[in-house]
């Protein structure tokens, strides 16, 4: 879990790109053939390849951090200026912003305190878990490439236990409206469809500065892995491209058995430690 803080959207975005790209998501090429290349040419080729992938991931991070920040700011503004907010207004804001995203496949608003909402009598039943204990608006985008295709997902009983939500609730500071939380890659399942994803989120507060919920966005790593692992981008025979975090936990790897394992689990060579240190730095 990473938390990014700033005093402005511009600075936040800068921090997100520099820290998350460097620490959470970075390309590591761990083997290559240099039979017909000089060492310098090989390093240049690898550098260019890495930059291409970093730029691609940077664009995704740019969008998700900006989107999370913008919607959280709007929601916090609504709750700060009103004791009760129309649930239809909130739904419209979240759906419209979500539809503009090219990468997020899910968005959600979790509220532990629903007294800030008006007209709860007519609320969509999908927003309330079967046991009646959890309120969340969860939306799925079936076609991220174009507008439309947004559907509502029924809130599961255990949704409040989502790792991102738990981490934000446990670590958020009173009235902190600037921190964006980025979860580690993990298996997620909102509607009986398990996938590997990453969550972005921010805390939501009422007009007294009390934490009342989380707005979040989820990206599916499948599309990212298809781009990163596309064989047409191979520079050398036997090269390996990996997406991992600063603990060496692998999110993308051509060997599916290596997913969510550490680099040390699949590579006992001393070079693995050097790669993880490079990611941290």
Sequence positions of predicted segments:
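Extracytoplasmic/periplasmic ligand-binding sensor domains
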Residues: 117-141, 148-154, 182-183, 194-199, ...
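Juxtamembrane membrane-water interface segments immediately C-terminal to a transmembrane helix
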Residues: 32-69, 76, 84
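Acidic surface patches and DE-rich sequence motifs
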Residues: 111, 129, 189-190, 206, ...
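Extracytoplasmic/periplasmic ligand-binding sensor regions of membrane-associated signaling proteins
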Residues: 141-226
């Amino acid at each position: 879990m990473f938390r990014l803080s700033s005093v402005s959207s511009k600075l936040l975005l800068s921090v997100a790109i520099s820290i998350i790209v460097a620490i959470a998501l970075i390309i590591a090429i761990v083997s290559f053939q240099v039979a017909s290349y000089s060492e310098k040419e090989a390093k240049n080729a690898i550098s260019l390849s890495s930059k291409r992938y970093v730029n691609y991931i940077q664009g995704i991070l740019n969008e998700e951090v900006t989107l999370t920040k913008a919607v959280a700011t709007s929601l916090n503004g609504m709750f700060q200026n009103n004791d009760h907010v129309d649930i239809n207004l909130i739904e419209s804001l979240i759906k419209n912003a979500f539809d503009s995203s090219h990468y997020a496949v899910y968005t959600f608003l979790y509220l532990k305190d629903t007294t800030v909402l008006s007209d709860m009598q007519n609320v969509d039943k999908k927003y309330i878990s079967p046991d009646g204990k959890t309120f969340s608006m969860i939306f799925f985008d079936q076609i991220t490439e174009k507008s439309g295709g947004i559907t509502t997902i029924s809130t599961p009983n255990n949704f409040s236990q989502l790792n991102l939500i738990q981490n934000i609730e446990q670590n958020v500071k009173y009235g902190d409206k600037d921190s964006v939380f980025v979860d580690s890659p993990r298996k997620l399942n909102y509607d009986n469809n398990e996938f590997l994803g990453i969550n972005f989120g921010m805390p939501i507060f009422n007009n007294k500065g009390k934490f009342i919920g989380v707005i979040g966005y989820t990206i599916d790593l499948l599309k990212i892995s298809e781009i990163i692992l596309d064989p047409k981008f191979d520079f050398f025979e036997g090269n390996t491209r990996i997406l991992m975090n600063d603990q060496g936990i692998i999110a993308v790897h051509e060997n599916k058995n290596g997913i969510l394992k550490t680099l040390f689990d699949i590579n006992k060579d001393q070079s693995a430690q050097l790669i993880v240190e490079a990611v941290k730095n």
